[in-house]
């Protein structure tokens, strides 16, 4: 059964401007430990790839927070939710700490879809309850 649905669109140019103003502090605030490694790797290769990665993760976390109905209120936080790719390339949501506990207690599972173009990143998240 569907528990919640969330979507978000992010202007990659705004992410670039924020990074320019605040440096890596913005990325370090939004990304979890494994995400920050991927961000730095992609950004070192091609700046635009790093920006797209950060924007899609920002967008996905916004969409996820909407789908679970908490917004960015505890136990939801930027770093307690990581969007990491499976070996197949499929994005998957990995939760940590109190958010992981909250999610498991409700027997929820999440599905995420990401896409980006030159100026925009969008995300769609469906959260459903697991069958009893």
Swiss-Prot record:
Mg(2+) binds at residues 8, 62. Keywords: Cytoplasm, Fatty acid biosynthesis, Fatty acid metabolism, Lipid biosynthesis, Lipid metabolism, Magnesium, Metal-binding, Transferase. GO terms for molecular function: holo-[acyl-carrier-protein] synthase activity; magnesium ion binding. Its EC number is 2.7.8.7. Its cofactor is Mg(2+). InterPro entries: 4-PPantetheinyl_Trfase_dom, 4-PPantetheinyl_Trfase_dom_sf, ACPS, Ppantetheine-prot_Trfase_dom. Transfers the 4'-phosphopantetheine moiety from coenzyme A to a Ser of acyl-carrier-protein. This is Holo-[acyl-carrier-protein] synthase. It comes from Leptothrix cholodnii (strain ATCC 51168 / LMG 8142 / SP-6). The lineage of its organism: Bacteria, Pseudomonadati, Pseudomonadota, Betaproteobacteria, Burkholderiales.
């Amino acid at each position: 059964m569907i528990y919640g649905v969330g979507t978000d669109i992010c202007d990659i140019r705004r992410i670039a401007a924020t990074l320019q103003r605040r440096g890596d502090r913005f990325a370090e605030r939004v990304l979890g430990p494994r995400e920050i490694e991927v961000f730095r790797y992609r950004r070192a290769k091609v700046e635009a790839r790093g920006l797209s990665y950060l924007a899609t993760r920002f967008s996905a976390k916004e969409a996820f927070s909407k789908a679970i109905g908490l917004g960015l209120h505890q136990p939801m936080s930027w770093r307690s939710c990581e969007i990491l790719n499976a070996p197949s390339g499929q994005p998957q949501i990995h939760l940590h700490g109190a958010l992981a506990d909250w999610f498991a207690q409700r027997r929820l599972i999440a599905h995420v879809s990401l896409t980006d173009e030159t100026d925009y990143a969008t995300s769609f998240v469906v959260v459903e309850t697991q069958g009893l």
